[in-house]
Swiss-Prot record:
GO terms for biological process: cell wall organization; peptidoglycan biosynthetic process; regulation of cell shape; response to antibiotic. Pfam families: BacA. Keywords: Antibiotic resistance, Cell inner membrane, Cell membrane, Cell shape, Cell wall biogenesis/degradation, Hydrolase, Membrane, Peptidoglycan synthesis, Transmembrane, Transmembrane helix. Its main location: membrane. The gene is uppP. It is a multi-pass membrane protein. Belongs to the UppP family. Its EC number is 3.6.1.27. It comes from Aromatoleum aromaticum (strain DSM 19018 / LMG 30748 / EbN1). InterPro entries: UppP (IPR003824). Catalyzes the dephosphorylation of undecaprenyl diphosphate (UPP). Confers resistance to bacitracin. This is Undecaprenyl-diphosphatase. Bacitracin is thought to be involved in the inhibition of peptidoglycan synthesis by sequestering undecaprenyl diphosphate, thereby reducing the pool of lipid carrier available. The chain crosses the membrane at residues 4-24, 41-61, 83-103, 108-128, 184-204, 218-238, 246-266. The lineage of its organism: Bacteria, Pseudomonadati, Pseudomonadota, Betaproteobacteria, Rhodocyclales. One of its GO terms (molecular function) is undecaprenyl-diphosphatase activity.
Amino acid sequence: MDLPLFVIALILGIVEGLTEFLPISSTGHLIIIGDLLGYNDATSKVFKIVIQFAAILAVCWDYRERLARVAAGVGSEPAAQRFVGLLFIGFLPAAVLGLMFHSTIKSLLFNPLTVATALVVGGVLILWLERRAYHPRINAVDEMRWADALKVGFAQAAAMIPGTSRSGATILGGLVFGLSRKAAAEFSFFLSIPTMFAATVYDLYKNRDLLHMGDLPVFAIGFVASFFAAMFAVKAFIRFISNHTFIAFAWYRIVFGLVVLATWQLELVEWSEP
C-alpha cells in the first residue's frame, strides 16, 4: 500500500497506543499492519521501538501521582519498597529469558503468520479462562505476595512470542493466580514500565546504527500519536474491565487472526512468511 511515510507513522503510532495495554498484542498488530502498509524495512524496527517507548511514558503519566509517591518513599517507606520489590520480581523472568532467546524469537517468529496463529490460540485460551470459576482473593496490587508477582512474571515471559500479548498474558495470568480484574490490569500496567523500558534500551542499543537524524520528523509523529492513544486506551480499559469480561477481546483476536490466515491461504494478500 503506497502511502506517504508520515501517514504510515501516524497510523502505526495510533495502533501501538491503542493496543499496547489491551490483551490483543500490540506487537502483533504492528507486524501485520506494518507488513500490509509495506513498512517493514530496517528503519521500521527502530520506529516501532520509539512508539513503544511513547506508550510506556503514557502509562507513567497516567499513574504519575502513585509513581511519584513510590519514588519519594522508596528509601524509607516499607510500602513503597515492597511495591518496587514486586515489580522487580515480576520483571526477572522476562529479563532472563529475554536475554537468552530475544534474538532467536525475533528472527524466527516476527512474521504475520506466526502472529495470526498466536492471536487465534490466545483468543481460544481467553474464552476457556473466562468460563472457569473466578474467585479473586487479591483486590489491590498492594495485597500481592512475592510468589504472585513471580508467577505473573513467568506469564509475561510467555508473551515474547509475537501475537500472544504481554498485557493479555500478565492480566489473565493474574486472574488465574487470584487477582481481581482491576488489580491484574494495574499490575500489568506497572510491570510494563521496567519491562518495556529495558526492552527499548536493549533494542535501541542493538539497532543504534539504524538511527538517522533524517528520520526524526517521522518518528516524532508516531511518538506523539502513540503517547496520546495510549493515554486514552489505559483509562478506557480500566473503566471497561470494571464491568465487563475479556470475552470481546477474545473474539476480536480470533476473528482478526483467522482473517489474516484466510487471506494468506487464499493468496489475497502477500504476507511475509517465516
